[in-house]
Amino acid sequence: MTNPIIAFQNVSKVFEDSGTQVLKDINFELEEGKFYTLLGASGSGKSTILNIIAGLLDATSGDVLLDGKRINDIPINKRDVHTVFQSYALFPHMNVFDNVAFALKLKKVPKKEIEERVKEALKMVQLDGYQKRSIQKLSGGQRQRVAIARAIINQPRVVLLDEPLSALDLKLRTEMQYELRELQKRLGITFVFVTHDQEEALAMSDWIFVMNDGEIVQSGTPVDIYDEPINHFVATFIGESNILPGVMIEDYLVEFNGKRFESVDGGMRPNEPVEVVIRPEDLQITLPEEGKLQVRVETQLFRGVHYEIIAYDNLGNEWMIHSTRKAIEGEIIGLDFTPEDIHIMRLNETEEEFDARIEEYVEMEEPEDGLIHAIEEERHEENS
């Protein structure tokens, strides 16, 4: 990566009053013009990172760089960043125009330029014509758009968003995910988004940092994080997972549930204890005699797009299956899966060790040929 817009170098944070360490030796670099997400549960340290970038908190140790320059001692108003808070922090006694124009008025920008820039900012967030509207008469989604317009009107290098969608209902939250992502692409500004919602992170991000207990546990693209979780925490935090104890017999051969299965993982010691992950959507229901495993259906819930089926094998392991086919409680079904559906996690493997192992065993990445190519390939296989 060349010329990162934001960099953390060995940044730690300890709250002096309690002695609690909330960040532990954080290192990362953010590229300009990307959408980054800090994903983690409450207390993981994600908002602390955001507040240190903004200048609302000081790092206890380490360096924070903006465009290559150390900004640890730079005051908030001198940093080329803007924060959108969860509460939006709008002025209720001001109308939409005055809220969005507030920073420009402080800078004594000419009146005509303020009017033009406010109009353009509101147009970008689909609030054109709302200049005179009272903040108190806006919906939650509209207030959020005003907060974003106020953030982008100064044309900052970085926009920080601290769980801005959490107060919205599900439908509006989904709509705003699309709008935020498209806005970021149009502006080309670096967005740093904080959330505890893994679906938001997967849907919106170019790059995700998964956090736990003040540390970055894993970072990568949404596809990488979902398909190749580095440990038990990530596998359970990102989506649903079936996780079972296993033994890596040798490269590409794993044993679990008393049987041996082909896999696509390697680089581990012979007979090394591992954890095996299979996602619920990767399990296909078959006749019992045709399945690689047999399970008894315990219960199921209809989730709209699929049935969520809970079943147990003869060793007592719980299995979650996502299927468009309805099961019958108490029946025995078969489960089928491919070697590509099996993901192997080493015990206590670091992200650096994981990356080195993957790089050694993956000679080249498959090209992203797109959906149309995938459909054509499937049809070719069906016809051959």
From Swiss-Prot:
One Pfam family it belongs to: TOBE_2
Membrane topology reported for the UniProt record: Peripheral membrane protein
Keyword vocabulary terms for this entry: ATP-binding, Cell membrane, Membrane, Nucleotide-binding, Translocase, Transport
EC number(s) from the headed UniProt entry: 7.6.2.11
Family label: Belongs to the ABC transporter superfamily. Spermidine/putrescine importer (TC 3.A.1.11.1) family.
Free-text function comment from the UniProt entry: Part of the ABC transporter complex PotABCD involved in spermidine/putrescine import. Responsible for energy coupling to the transport system.
Name this polypeptide is given: Spermidine/putrescine import ATP-binding protein PotA
Organism: Streptococcus thermophilus (strain CNRZ 1066)
